[in-house]
Amino acid sequence: MQSATSFFNRALFRKNLQRFWPLWFGYVLIWLLLLPLPLLNELADYHGVPIVADASYYLLQIGAYGGLVMGAVFGIFFAMAMFSYLTAPRATQGFHSMPVRRETLYATNYLTGLVCMVSALVLAFALAGITAACFGALDLTALGTALLAAVLSVLFFYSFAVLCMMFTGQILAAPVFYGTLNFLAVGMEYLVRTFAGNFLYGYSGYSAPETFAFLSPAWELVCVLDVSNVARVDRILSDGTYQVIRGGEYMLSGLGVLGIYAAVGIVLAVLGLLVYRRRASEATGSIVTVAWARPIFKYGVAVCAAFSLGQLIYFLVFGLNLHNGQYSLPGTIACMLFTGLLGYFAAEMLLHKSFRVWRTGRVGALVFSAVLVCFGVAMSLDLTGYEGYTPDAEEVEFVSVYLSSNGDYLSCKLDEPESIERTLAAHRAMIADKARQLSYARTTYETPADAPVDSYLYFTVTYALTDGRVVRRSYGDCRAFSRELNEPGSVAQTMTALLNCPEAALDRVLGELADDKSNAYLTGGYYDVVSDGAYGEDDGELTAAQANTLVSALRRDYEAGHASNASLFEDTLYSGSFYVELELWYSVRVDEKPTRQPIDTTSSSSGSVCAIVTPEMTCTLEALAGMGIETPATARGF
């Protein structure tokens, strides 16, 4: 027997290997079936000479995603095996009566599981490397990166699982805690956003990135890890631009995030030791063994049940044929209160191992009920000021706007002071019209034919503030009325003013080309003169020089207000008897120097924008005439 002050117990280590070798063997076998054997088959069946990049891609894919899944699944299995004695009273008393410190027990059991998992990885990746080398397709960098990713995943998930084992004395509770905590933050954030989206006017959290996803490790790593092709800037073209060509190599992104989680895993392992040192042997068999964690478990179950089951019950019973404007906040809170109390008392029963929990849990139930009701009251009265908040114009660096209607639409980024002021005015008009907009939504989703609705609106605004904050609001299924166009501050008047501000009008037509500082350059285009609805009266291609001339003319027309006013109620671009359709082609200039550094290859390097030239746009019509493009004399106006 080792000394009581020893950090590592060899006898216990060997005993663990003897007891749990089937789990170890199964883990090794699965890794062999995942990595070296499929790689061997792929390289053996390859037509021609195997490419190193193909083997590298497979190694990185398995190292990242296979390591993530295997580490997450088998991490809890090995933790349950190595610390299974903590869930049986006799085994717990037996281990703790040994002349071995708890630190030694913890370290030995922890390292046994870690050695089993890491040794399997080393064996599998070593065989994969030998296989690739035999076919001349070995990339040591990719092999090492893939192995490192798998080891880091094991380190975090196994440590996390061990920590979960320290908090429970029930063997089956450990995987439940472990699985729940891996997705709890992102799940609760989704449920809270769903609740807010139903009852907060203008809430746009659905489109915002998850704020607390990093607290859900499995979800975050699935989103972050990615194996992508490395793009390289290979050569400079004659016009001074760079040609981006995909390279044959692959890279694993997200490895830094995985390294952070692995470092957190080491911290979790130390925390597990601290919890184990203070864990009472008598707590074996309890659902939660740590006293301070029992209230967290109890109220956590209540909150999760309220937001998940409560909203689900309300939706199934009342909400299948409803829409956001028709949801009842009191009804939803009542369902959440019912399911939350069920969850609360269920947790009490698990903690006390008895059905008689009313006396011990009634105070906590009242506290939970009061908090939930206060939450509902705060939502209904908008005590946080969320619905009515708009930033000051001086605080806004730029604003992204999306506005769709029965007529024209707008989707662009605005940074001019006038544009920001008009956006804020339209936003405030939507806030002031809240009661009427919601009343239309509650009346019926299908508006009757005789209802005074001229246009449906969908309005989304995202403010980027100078202090780095982002404010998002979204208003869907709204209405605008043409009879209110001349009423200052009305939805129709402010939205129309926003559509027709020079910056918005120019951006609506020219898109990326509207910005003088854009790195896009024109390569040509196409024109088509449409008269009385007939296409093909006069059409043809445009040179790059002609396209640049037309863009300058379009910019002058829009800045001078020559274009027809945009409307919420009709499509102004195609409503006339004469117009010219322009399709302008552009490419995006790559500013990077010739290098092999990774470049974002997901964004398009070329594209096109369409512009409609109406009879009022005299500058553009003059430019077309100067190019010899015939237009109806009555429309040219010169």
Model regions: which residues?
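Long, hydrophobic alpha-helical segments
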Residues: 63-91
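Function-determining sites in protein domains
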Residues: 359-368, 375-638
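Secretory targeting signals
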Residues: 57, 64, 111-174, 186-187, ...
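Aromatic- and glycine-rich beta-strand/loop motifs that create alpha-glucan
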Residues: 1-28
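Central hydrophobic cores of alpha-helical transmembrane segments
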Residues: 172-185, 360-372
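Internal/C-terminal transmembrane anchor helices
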Residues: 297-308, 344-386
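Terminal transmembrane helical anchor/hairpin motif
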Residues: 41-59, 186-275, 280-289, 307-335, ...
